[in-house]
Amino acid sequence: MHEDRKEGAMWRRTGWLVVTVCVLSVALNSAAYGVDLKWWSHWAIEDNKKLVLFEVKKRFEAKHPGNTVTITFYEKANMFPVLRAAFTAGSGFPDVFYYEADVPEFIPAGWLADMSTGIRWENIEPSAKAFWTRPGPGGKMAPWAIAVESASDELYYNKKMFQQLGITVPANGVFTAEQFKDVVGKCIKSGVAAFATGTSDREYPALYIPSELLLGKIGGDEVKKLVRGELSWKDPRVVEVFRYYRELIDMGAYSKAMTSMTLAESHRYFHTDQKACMFPVSSWYTGRSFVPPEKGGQPKDFELGMLNYPMMKDGKGANQKYIGYQGSLAVAAMGPNLALAMEVANTFADPEIGNLWAGKTGIQTGIKTDVPKIDSPIKWYIDMFHQVNRNTKWQDIAVQTFKLNMKPEMWEVWVSILNQGLPNKLIGADEALDKLEAARLKFK
């Protein structure tokens, strides 16, 4: 019996040794061959943003030897339909991917991984974490993405063109509504459009001017009520804004090429072709325009200026401006490499990455930064941005994130009227408001 016990113990030790060897073999095999994580991203033609993503890839791979990351760049308009189809099919999707408010339905569908753990949230701005903390499957509240890009809705202008037209910008960068109408008139009379806006491949470019006019007139809190359906579109203040906006349209503020012009083309229309005085767009303008001219960037001698949006008479939104979190990173909930994919996302949660993003792109970020340590070749722009926005009261909603505050059906009506019908003179101001109010009551 004693020999039997010794033999049993020996076999148990041998068994554990075999198990240990197997585990080590699997670990060594994984380290040797590793995993190639797939990452799909927007920003196909934005080299400065790519530099940041490649730095994240480099840091992740250095920290996780044997594992690699392959980034495939798309234009988001092409990426999201493919991504939706892959998630619906349950195969063919990446481990990590670009995410933003264009596709809010991805969260309740369960396609994004819960980021409650695994991310160094202490290195992310609290407002950025709060922005993507939303109801998921079954109403579960969790953060679902890291807000890499934060962008405000700005109004850029051609300094040289303004000088040639005799337009003097007020010290605070704010024209009154009547002064702004004069500015628009001078641009049009000189043979160029007032606004370099192209709507052929995006659902929001023509929303900037009317949305900012509404903000200036009624203020951020009332705008939120309006987009949530809690305030009537027949409110006299809203009617005033729409009628004023239609006056600008009737003057010829938009280019006749607006409906056939893409977002990328509208950038070139502004800074290279110089066929428009102003460009209402988010502050990610720099991502497309601060690249070499041969890659679509603005000419080296182009004189870029920044305005604040005009103020309507008796406006309640003085110094207010929209800001929102946009280009973000999410992890596929159904991915086979969830832990490693989460580590890719976690690599973004670092002030050094925040500094790199701010310095290379000139765009705000949801990642915490150490401002004195930001090294940037576009410091002149960063200084101008802060000068123009020195008195700005930021409103945590933006033209592109109205979609998160509107019911889907209401958003469709909003886009069809403001991005298509009204700027193309297919519908009048009062008729537009009738349709918006009818939709508000129907989808309330």
Question: What are these model-predicted stretches?
Answer:
Residues A32-W111, W121-N123, V169, Q298, ...:
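Conserved N-terminal structural module of periplasmic/extracytoplasmic solute-binding proteins
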Residues E100-E154, K181, D301-Y309:
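Hinge/lid segment of periplasmic solute-binding proteins
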Residues G138, A147, I323, G366-V371, ...:
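C-terminal capping/gating helix-and-loop segments adjacent to ligand/active sites or protein-protein/ligand interfaces
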Residues L112, W284-K295, M312, G327-P408:
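Mature extracytoplasmic/periplasmic domains
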Residues H42, F97, P104, Y208, ...:
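Extracytoplasmic/periplasmic substrate-binding proteins
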Residues F73-V82, V174-Q179, M258-H271:
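Short helix-initiation/N-cap motifs at beta->coil->alpha
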Residues S116-A130, N172-G173, K217-E240, P293-P299, ...:
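Short, solvent-exposed loop/beta-turn-alpha elements that line the ligand-binding surface or hinge
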